[in-house]
Amino acid sequence: PYELTGSLDVLFAEVANNQPVLVMQNLGFDWLPQWHYAVVVGYDLERETVTLRSGEEKRHVVPIYTFDKTWARARRWAMVAALPERIPVSADADQYVRVVHEVEKLHPEIAVSAYQHAIDRWPDNALIWLALGNALYSQQQYQGSVTTYREALRFHPDNEQLWNNYAYALNSVECGEASRAAIHCAVRIKPNDPLLIDSLYDLHQYNAKTALLCDVVHCPL
């Protein structure tokens, strides 16, 4: 579930994208509320109407003005139950990652799919790359996490957290030399970061043996 910002423009944009939107209305008064859930399934700007699936009514048509008043009395709460491959058109990247992270706690496979589709939409967002790499790593899909961090660093070569996580992923696939090179790249970017210094010492405790097929790591200039 993804909560929308409460505006008619956002609401109509989602509906125009064939995404039904669950809304809360107050059909009563502020001092005597009558809470009601409905699903917005259509609108007509020429006729100034909104079509709701409300209770047992599949197509309840009301004026936009009336709908907006009852919606406003419920603080314009709205949400969509989006599938991983159908990101809300009005979604904010960082907020979307936070929502998917909550899903990840119970449904890690669905979260991975959601992160992958989010990267297709926001390839320049480092947080999404980190989230995908971390999700794969936590599921012990170490080679997948290596590939994810490597690809992410093409877009964000100066992101020390990506380098740090890339180093740990490389270490998990027995690429010790590449792992140490990657953590040195992270430290070069932020030499006084105590967490990176800890990672540097930690990774140097492992055997530096190298598997047959390992990444060749080059720090950004």
Give the location of each predicted region.
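Helix-start (N-cap) detector for alpha-helical repeat units in TPR-like alpha-solenoids
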Residues: 93, 126-127, 160-161, 194-195
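Canonical positions in the second alpha-helix
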Residues: 118, 151-152, 185-186
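Noncatalytic regulatory segments and standalone regulatory/sensor domains
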Residues: 44-130
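Active-site-adjacent substructure of cysteine-protease-like catalytic cores
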Residues: 4-53
